[in-house]
Amino acid sequence: MDAVSQVPMEVVLPKHILDIWVIVLIILATIVIMTSLLLCPATAVIIYRMRTHPILSGAV
């Protein structure tokens, strides 16, 4: 007999460290954080320009 055939199934398939839903939540939280880091500075610049240049409020 081979040594591979004598190995129990639990040893061949390791258990996941984290559940699937935890991994999905981490990925979603990362997407939300990265999106806010990209959009918040741009929004702050648009609001600043609209307040400091009221004549050009329509064109940013």
Swiss-Prot record:
Site (Cleavage): 19-20
Intracellular or extracellular location(s): Membrane
Pfam families per record: Smim3
Keywords on record: Membrane, Transmembrane, Transmembrane helix
Keyword Membrane: yes
Keyword Transcription tagged: no
Induction (free text): By NGF.
One MF term in the entry's GO annotations: identical protein binding
Transmembrane intervals: 20-40
Annotated membrane topology: Single-pass membrane protein
A cellular component annotation (GO) from this entry: membrane
Lineage top rank: taxon: Eukaryota
Protein name, per record: Small integral membrane protein 3
Organism ancestry: Eukaryota, Metazoa, Chordata, Craniata, Vertebrata
